[in-house]
Design a protein with these regions (language model features):
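A structural micro-motif
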Residues: 61, 90-91, 118, 145-147
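Short, glycine/charge-rich flexible loops or terminal/linker lids adjacent to PRPP-binding catalytic cores
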Residues: 71-121, 128-136
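Short, solvent-exposed loop/turn segments at secondary-structure junctions
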Residues: 68-71, 154-156
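A short, conserved beta-to-alpha structural element at the edge of catalytic cores
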Residues: 97-98, 137-157
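Active-site-facing substrate-recognition patch
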Residues: 1-57, 61, 96-119, 129, ...
Length: 157
């Protein structure tokens, strides 16, 4: 049973579905298991519907992820966000932002593929410090976007 958690970290509020890890698996194991993509989608879509609304429409809402730093192909978070977007009927904007460094804390993101929709769901698969979410918040707010932050796993107790 999902246990939602609203967390404020790095001056950003986000909703997470799981705390720490799923079934005692490491984050690397979770990302390597292709079936976990659909598991995340199936688990997160009802939560998004309940938190944001059941009548999310294309033209008003979009979904993005935080910048990809390591796995540019078959990126776990991007695959989940794209599946969520398809299920909800809203566009997924691939590569919304770029990060010039691999640093997570204090990162500054550059715009790349900013949604035209006014409301944006920012999805991140795993959150630890919240710095990545803060950088996305700063970027999207500069572009006058309303943001809702949804994460799969809150990786910090």
């Amino acid at each position: 049973t999902p246990k939602l958690r609203l967390t404020r970290r790095a001056s950003t509020n986000f909703i997470s579905l799981w705390q720490k890890s799923i079934f005692g698996r490491t984050l690397t194991e979770i990302k390597a298991d292709g079936s976990m993509v659909q598991f995340f989608i199936d688990s997160l879509v009802p939560i998004i519907n309940e938190c944001v609304g059941y009548h999310i429409s294309s033209g008003n809402w979009a979904i993005v992820t935080t910048p990809m730093r390591r796995h540019r192909e078959h990126n776990f978070a991007s695959r989940i966000a794209e599946g969520i977007g398809n299920t909800l009927g809203i566009p997924f904007y691939f590569d919304c932002a770029h990060c010039q460094s691999k640093q997570r804390v204090g990162a500054v993101f550059l715009p790349n593929n900013i949604p035209t929709e006014p409301n944006v769901i920012v999805f991140d698969d795993f959150v630890t410090t919240g710095s990545t979410l803060l950088a996305m918040k700063n970027l999207l707010h500069e572009h006058q976007k309303n943001t809702v932050f949804i994460t799969g796993i809150n990786n910090k107790l």
